Amino acid sequence: MDKKKKIALITGICVVSLLLIYTLLGFFGLPYAIKNIAPKYLKDYNATLFVSDAKFNPFTFELNATNAELNTTSPLFSTKQIDLKLKPFSIFKKLVEIDIFRLDEPKVKIARDKKANFNFSNFISDDNATSEDNSTSSINFALNNAKIIKGSFSYSDQNLTKPFNVSFDDINYELSSLNTKKNRDRKSVV
C-alpha cells in the first residue's frame, strides 16, 4: 500500500470514528446526563430532578424530555413534556438561538414558608445580593418560537398573618421572535 492510500485510510477511519463517537454521545450520552448526572449536580442545591425519559437527536439538535419534575423543599416545577430545538451554528454569529421551546402541561408552584423562605431560594446565592455586575454580554439570545400548552401556576404564602393562596390553570401562551440582538440604532429587538 502506498503512502497516499495509507494516509487516506487513516483519515477516513478517524473521520468515521469521530462521527460514531459524536452520534453515540448525542443519542445516548446527553439523555443519560440529563437523567442521571444533572440530578446529582442539583443535590448540591438540596433539589431533586426526575426525568422519566429524555431523547436527543445530534443531527437535528432536538431534545425531548417527558415527565420532568424539579423539587426543593416542596414541588417547584413539573411538566408532561419539554421540546427544544436548537440552532447551534448561530453561535458563530455570537447568538444562542433556540428555534422551538415548548412546554406541555407545565406546573409552576411558588411557595413561601412560615420562615419567609421561598421554595426556589436554594438556587439563589447570597453572594450575588451585594455585588453588581454592569457588564454586557457579547453573546445575544434569540427565541424564535415558545409555547406553553395547558400550563398552571400557583403561589402560596404561609408567612402572612392569614395564609394566601392563588392559582391559575389552563394557561396557553405563545411567543415568537424574542431577540436580544441589537439593531443598527443600538436598541434591543423584542
Regions found by a protein language model. Give the residues of each.
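Surface-exposed loop/turn segments flanking beta-strands in extracellular/periplasmic regions
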Residues: 120-128
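Conserved small/polar residues in nucleotide/adenosyl-binding loops
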Residues: 189-190
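A short linear hydrophobic-aromatic micro-motif
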Residues: 49-53
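N-terminal type II signal-anchor transmembrane helix
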Residues: 1-46
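Flexible beta-edge/linker motif
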Residues: 55-117, 131-159, 174-186
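Short acidic/polar N-terminal linker immediately downstream of export determinants
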Residues: 45-48, 129-135
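Short, flexible N-terminal segments of the mature chain
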Residues: 169-173
